[in-house]
Regions:
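Surface-exposed loop/turn motifs in large extracellular/passenger domains
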Residues: 1-24, 33-52, 62-82, 91-111, ...
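Helix-turn-helix-like N-terminal two-helix hairpins of bacterial/phage DNA-binding regulators
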Residues: 28-30, 57-59, 87-88, 117
Length: 226
């Protein structure tokens, strides 16, 4: 793949165009860290990018036992598929995905078995710092269940407790700056992500009109103004 070798981190990686196909070996990310290595400060601004891990590493992010941090995609067509127990974009097996921003382009993120589409690998978290904005068109799905629970579309990887498999918790991304043309499509864990999604998220819009008074609290995308 592209990034760190065995026990090596992969950081400060920028792709601006062209056609890039990156496949990591066992424990290595497609783009990012090698075995036990974090994948951080990874930026894609354009091009056609396909990133897959052989096993245990994220498509884009951490290798096996490596976190995926500060990953930004602002354009292009990006397909990221995690290896077994890893996220599509984010953490490798048993590691987290943090500070992930999708602000443009067409992005498809699929978790490997029990991994999140975007977020954490097996038994690991995807932080709340996932932002989808602009004209981004994002497709996500978690990995199918195994002995552990299925991964979230965006959020945590699956885990197993004393009672059996536990599915990964979904984390709500920040869509405050998502344009009307942008969207997030969630597909069933383990699916091929074609046809009708199980859920589509867009940023609702509306108009507020007033002709008098004083604004005392400005509206935000998460709350009304008065």
């Amino acid at each position: 793949g592209i990034g760190g070798g065995s026990s090596g981190a992969g950081s400060d990686i920028t792709i601006t165009g062209g056609k890039v196909t990156a496949r990591g070996g066992n424990y290595g990310a497609g783009i990012g860290g090698g075995a036990y290595g974090n994948g951080s400060d990874i930026t894609v601004t354009g091009g056609e990018v396909t990133a897959n891990s052989g096993n245990y590493g994220a498509g884009i992010g951490g290798g096996g036992w490596g976190n995926g941090n500060n990953i930004s995609i602002s354009g292009g067509k990006v397909t990221a598929t995690g290896g077994t127990f890893a996220a599509g974009i984010g953490g490798g097996m048993h590691r987290d995905g943090n500070d992930i921003t999708i602000s443009g382009g067409e992005v498809s993120a699929a978790g490997g078995r029990c991994g999140a589409g975007i977020g954490g690998g097996l038994d690991a978290r995807g932080s709340g710092d996932v932002t989808v904005s602009g004209d981004a068109k994002l497709k996500v799905r978690g990995g199918k269940t195994g002995d552990d629970g299925q991964g979230a579309g965006i959020g945590n990887g699956g885990v197993r407790d004393q009672n059996g498999p536990v599915n990964g918790t979904e984390v709500e991304p920040d869509i405050c700056a998502l344009n009307p043309s942008g969207k997030i499509e969630y597909y069933a864990p383990g699916s091929v992500m074609t046809g009708t999604p199980s859920k589509t998220v867009t940023n609702p819009t509306g108009d507020f009109v007033w002709d008098s008074g004083t604004v005392t609290t400005h509206a935000t995308c998460k709350g009304k103004g008065v």
